[in-house]
Amino acid sequence: MTIFEQMESEVRSYSRGWPVVFDRAVGSQMFTADGDRYLDFFAGAGALNYGHNNAGLKQKLVDYILRDGVTHSLDMFTEARRDFLQTFQDVILQPRGLDYRIMFPGPGGANAVEAAMKLARKVTGRTTIVHFTNSFHGMTEGALSVTGNALKRGGAGHPLHHAVAVPFDGYLGGEADTLAYFEKLLDDSGSGVDTPAGVIVETVQGEGGINVATPEWLRKLRDLTTRHGIVLIVDDVQMGCGRTGGFFSFEESGIVPDIVTLSKSIGGYGLPMALTLLKPELDQWKPGEHNGTFRGIAPAFLTGAEALRLYWADGELEASTLRKGERINEVFTEIAADAAPEMQLKVRGRGLARGIEFPSGELAGAVCRAAFERGMLMETSGAGGTVMKVLPALTITDDEVEEGLAIIRASVREVLGSTSEELAADEVPLPVVVGS
């Protein structure tokens, strides 16, 4: 038994599917203590959009530490905090015509979500938060209440209240108008659904299976929430910071949410940091009404600001992300077309959040396991883990993209058999389905 097995809780997940000991990482490559190399198409579940140990950020961080720059500051004023706020305003908000106050709720995405829901309830005086089928918003109890995943919800140990799930875009299939259903519930006094305080939505459901909301659906949702006086919260924890192309995942739709949550890659270097962006008229907090010990980690301010300057002062990263995403989509479409018809593989995604849906979680997991054996990291997502998901760093090179696609193609062929054969009768090992 290793020290990990001896000391760590049974709750650990990723290490079960990737049973190696990592030691170093650079860009989109990770290396084990034994020197084995792995191509990373996981990127810390979206926390490493700029890759591991990004050279443009690393030296700034090292220099800051060596000069004894402030590390922990709660919400005290610091030079690092000022620089981040000014850079975020100049590089992100002003060019997009967005007017948000910035709240630092704590170190992680669930902190940002909790703050958003608390504020929606505070300003409206209502209780319920509406979320969508297959949503994932975090592991704290409030965030779990608006999460669809039964395994995650079960970890709470008691019923989760004050939340209502409605169908996400495409959930009912075909041409079904899921927002018409939602609005019918709101308009019908006999539906049993009260007007909610807020609606929380992911424009692309990452953990839910790379389910993509169309721009038209998002615009209809924005219109619906405006007409009913409901606070619209966009959870951009995983899909923000350029994952879908634009800095915010909602940019393509043209909507302006009332509240936006950011975390994961907002710190630039993989350091913990979260933001809750809110329209000024919603900033009705009393001083200290929501706080947290680790809401002022200056090294994350430092690398977060530098990442904004390096990658968001022009449109180069966005264009590169969209181009690489289209290349992945092209190959995934070929893989789906090459598979036996009964497999009915479905390709999903936007930008560099891409996936292939398989008929079962066993198959999707087996593909991820085969890729790991070939030296590549990727995971499954969705109900039952049926979607093979890739979230490579936005800075991944074209050569690394092609290497990863070749591994995926070979892994799918290994698991499904040749393009003309039915799935082999051999038992496929059940994978561990993990989530961030």
Model-derived segments and spans:
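Conserved N-terminal phosphate-binding loop of PLP-dependent enzymes in the Aspartate aminotransferase
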Residues: 1-436
